[in-house]
């Protein structure tokens, strides 16, 4: 490199600045923003259609290599691209970041300059300046003093300098697009924050058991699931319809501190979760966790139950109850639901009989009492610190959209000798603005006018 190459006037010296300006201009292009938004939408739809966070076996069964879905989407491709966790993949987050940068660049390059232009205005001091307005008229009489009350009635903000007048209203319509951009950026920040700081967990907890959130299957790199409190499942139950179908299932949950003091309590059901300390507990499923039985006059004891796979996919749970002290013999108890009935089989697989909760059944010389069926609540536990931020962003977007529909209207007037010039323009609702201006002109004209507003109002489009 020579001395001349390092001088301020060297082309190499200005090269980084040119690259920066070119890149900024490109990223601020509306077409680029739309393309990024479309890509984000497509991958978001894929994340909705394709089950997220399932096991490899699930994807192998539902997305086989032969035949592959759409000819190419096999489980290997799906996992390789990260389509099993779309919203936390590096490329999805890069798209969100790029879209946010595009919005910021567009805001500073287009929207803020447009607002600045709207706030900077000039008086019209020459008649020919009115010719460039979409709507203008020339009257042989009129005054600014008679015009000002009419504009004030229409809620215009008025500025006057001698015989020159400028009025405007609806500048909030210029601020609206900026608010929309800010709202979208806030929404993106909330989404990224939720992806990095949130987690999801699943728990299957029997009634009467205390638990902490441990079974986390999806977590952001900055997430923290450990909390100084735990949750008691006070009770789980199911309401059934008269036909035996499930109507709704409920969990009575209590949040307790390390000393057992209750901090929060709520009975949750499907679509009615418990929210506490940034974590939401959703009621999603259920199971039979165990059975409580009594043999003759023995103490009541609880045995675990396990789900048994069936050919038709029907739900079935079973438990084994020893009937001898050395556990050398026992019976099997099968249950389909929590309606209080069970079927008992001996070791040979022969039916002993059916029994309901609270009833006894003789098994040889043993009297077996079915005390209770213990239900387990299936909870989906989710923490997303970005949710309040996302909601705030949505509110800002909606507010900005409403503001954007406000028309930004401008009116100029000039009293020059015995001539009076009046004109204006608006960025939307052209017909309504024309009627408004005609109404003002009609008020200004006297009965001795030589022409009517209809034939004096002109449009540069004609």
UniProtKB/Swiss-Prot annotation:
This protein's record includes keyword Transmembrane helix: yes
Subcellular location(s) per record: Cellular thylakoid membrane
InterPro entries: Cyt_c_bgen_Ccs1/CcsB/ResB, ResB-like_domain
Any GO BP: cytochrome complex assembly
Annotated membrane topology: Multi-pass membrane protein
Keyword Methyltransferase attributed: no
Entry keywords, A to Z: Cytochrome c-type biogenesis, Membrane, Thylakoid, Transmembrane, Transmembrane helix
Stretches that traverse the bilayer: 30-50, 89-109, 175-195
Pfam families recorded: ResB
GO cellular component labels: plasma membrane-derived thylakoid membrane
PANTHER family: CYTOCHROME C BIOGENESIS PROTEIN CCS1, CHLOROPLASTIC (PTHR31566:SF0)
Record text on subunit structure and interactions: May interact with CcsA.
Function field: Required during biogenesis of c-type cytochromes (cytochrome c6 and cytochrome f) at the step of heme attachment.
Protein family (similarity comment): Belongs to the Ccs1/CcsB family.
Record's protein name: Cytochrome c biogenesis protein CcsB
Lineage, opening ranks: Bacteria, Bacillati, Cyanobacteriota, Cyanophyceae, Oscillatoriophycideae
Gene coding for it: ccsB
């Amino acid at each position: 490199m020579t001395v001349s190459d390092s001088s301020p006037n060297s082309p190499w010296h200005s090269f980084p600045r040119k690259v920066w300006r070119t890149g900024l201009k490109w990223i601020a292009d509306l077409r680029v923003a739309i393309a990024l938004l479309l890509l984000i939408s497509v991958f978001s739809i894929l994340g909705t259609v394709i089950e997220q966070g399932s096991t490899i076996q699930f994807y192998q069964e539902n997305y086989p290599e032969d035949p592959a879905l759409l000819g190419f989407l096999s489980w290997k491709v799906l996992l390789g691209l990260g389509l099993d966790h779309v919203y936390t993949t590096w490329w999805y987050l890069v798209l969100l970041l790029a879209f946010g940068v595009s919005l910021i660049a567009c805001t500073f390059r287009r929207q803020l300059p447009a607002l600045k232009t709207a706030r900077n205005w000039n008086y019209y001091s020459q008649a020919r300046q009115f010719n460039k307005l979409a709507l203008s008229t020339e009257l042989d009489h009129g005054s600014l003093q008679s015009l000002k009350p009419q504009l004030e009635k229409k809620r215009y903000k008025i500025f006057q300098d001698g015989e020159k007048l400028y009025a405007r209203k609806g500048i909030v319509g210029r601020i609206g697009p900026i608010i929309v951009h800010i709202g979208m950026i806030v929404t993106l920040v909330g989404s990224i924050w939720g992806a990095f700081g949130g987690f999801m967990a699943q728990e299957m907890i029997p009634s009467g058991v205390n638990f902490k959130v441990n079974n986390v299957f999806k977590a952001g790199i900055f997430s923290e699931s450990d909390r100084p409190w735990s949750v008691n499942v006070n009770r789980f139950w199911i309401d059934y319809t008269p036909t035996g179908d499930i109507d709704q299932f409920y969990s009575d949950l209590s949040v307790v501190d390390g000393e057992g003091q209750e901090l929060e309590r709520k009975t949750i059901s499907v679509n009615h979760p418990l929210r506490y300390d940034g974590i939401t507990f959703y009621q999603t499923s259920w199971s039979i966790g165990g059975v409580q039985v009594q043999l003759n006059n023995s103490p009541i004891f609880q045995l675990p139950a396990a789900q048994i796979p069936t050919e038709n996919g029907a739900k079935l749970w079973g438990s084994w109850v020893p009937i001898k002290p050395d556990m050398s013999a026992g019976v099997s108890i099968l249950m389909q639901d929590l309606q209080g009935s069970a079927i008992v089989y001996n070791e040979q697989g022969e039916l002993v009989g059916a029994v309901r909760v609270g009833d006894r059944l003789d098994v040889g010389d043993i009297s077996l009492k079915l005390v209770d069926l213990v239900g387990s609540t299936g909870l989906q536990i989710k923490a997303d610190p970005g949710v309040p931020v996302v909601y705030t962003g949505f509110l800002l977007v909606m507010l900005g959209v409403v503001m954007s529909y406000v028309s930004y209207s401008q009116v100029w007037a000039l009293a020059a000798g015995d001539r009076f010039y009046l004109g204006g323009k608006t960025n939307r609702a052209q017909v309504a603005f024309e009627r408004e201006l005609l109404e003002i002109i009609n008020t200004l004209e006297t009965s001795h006018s030589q022409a009517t507003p209809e034939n004096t109002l002109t449009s540069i489009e004609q």
